[in-house]
Amino acid sequence: MVTVRSLGLNGIGGYEVGVECFLSGGLPAFDVVGLPDAAVREARDRVRAAIKNCGAKFPVSRITVNLAPARLRKEGTLYDLPILLGILTASDELKALPENAAFLGELSLSGQLRPVTGVLPMALYAARSGIRELYVPEENAAEATLAENLTVYGVRDVGQLVRHLRREEPMAPAEPWQPTRQDLHLPDMADVMGQENVKRALEIAAAGGHNVLLIGSPGSGKSMLARRLPSILPDMTHEESMQTTEIYSVAGLTDARSPLVTHRPFRSPHHTASPVSLAGGGTVPRPGEISLAHNGILFLDELPEFDKSALETLRQPLEDGVVTITRAAGSLTLPSRFMLVCAMNPCRCGWYGHPSGRCTCSEAQVENYMRRISGPLLDRIDMHVEVPSVEYDAMRRRTQPESSAVIRARVNAAREIQKARFSGIGISCNAYMTPAMIGQFCDLDPAGERLMQGAFDRMGLTGRSHDRILRMARTIADLEGSEAIRPDHLAEAIQYRSTSILK
């Protein structure tokens, strides 16, 4: 019996799979066991054709392949290559395989290797578990080299790998992928005329990682402003890039030529999105939009039009930064630390409160429209910002609005303050402060205490709202470079908690 080391995926985490191949006498047969899915079972035909087309002899024996551990379901086509190598080694077409080496890849009938998904998390697991060499399809090699302390070989076809293993034509290891400066041309805040108050709110949101709800009539610029928010966010750290790339690798969204995700994600699902497409899951659990927005922005336009059950899936991730998917076979936890940015009209016709008086909705219809969004979800959105219609004078003004670069410089300065504040704590911005941290970093003077108490009683705030206001006030103080939260910082934070929308 021969065992070939390979790897598998459980959510976005890797684990080792032992591909055991046993050749015995009896009628020729080829069985794959160890809880394989349909794609793994189909490997029998791909492997047989690839062996014959690379010039090797397919054994006339009873072949049994076991994928261990058998308790975990094996999915996908990545086991084609280790199954082929196990058969060739068991039939003495190959000598012993290299120690501390793992193999994965899909085969074509001609013996060419095709790329597979989830290579980065598997490579990271391999590097941690003592595997020193990893053989992957050529198109996956750059992604695999993102894992440190691992020698990666990009394999073009079975013939090339067989010659390498026989020491006839040694392959050169893949060069570690080096990131290059990629200037992503994002829409600029300078494109938006007027709306200075809304831009200020978005600057605060970007500086502290706060969630935002934009409410305004059609054409007021809600979507335009939201799509320019990425241009004022700080760059991702290397750790954040690796976390996001792992998720994108599992989802099959990485670029073979530039595998590392270096720009913050901006995900904007349509309002017909299902709960599974948002939260992730399915028969074979995969990351949803919530996880694909990790370290970036999840933008929900026309918020009340989303299915209520889909919106309710946001509640746990907004609090915990992870989404837990439970299935019969077990539970799966995926990272989902994102900024939620939502946009909505104030009523079904969209013109409630507009100076033109064009709204045709009754008060009852307006209230019913607002009730589509649950109070608990709205309570988790830090900032409720009204986006007024743009005035003609603002449209025709000759002065150039502030560019994203200018706003981003202020955001970066505030983030540096937060980075120093939370050094060694494990969070990156004010929005993620725990209640204990709020008590430590959000002290109020007597005037601030009176202001906060008055707002709490008058507005009927919840404990969660209270904490979110203090987090926002801390961010506003950071933007001004102030160590203390002054009453004017607190007053500005309080104004972003709309009560009318919660009625």
Name every feature range the model reports, one short phrase each.
Residues 33-44, 57-59, 66-76, 284-285, ...:
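Basic, amphipathic alpha-helical bundle interface domains used for macromolecular binding and assembly
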Residues 214, 300, 343:
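Hydrophobic anchor at the beta1->P-loop junction of P-loop NTPases
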Residues 214-255, 320:
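Walker A/P-loop
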Residues 295, 301-302, 313:
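Walker B catalytic acidic pair
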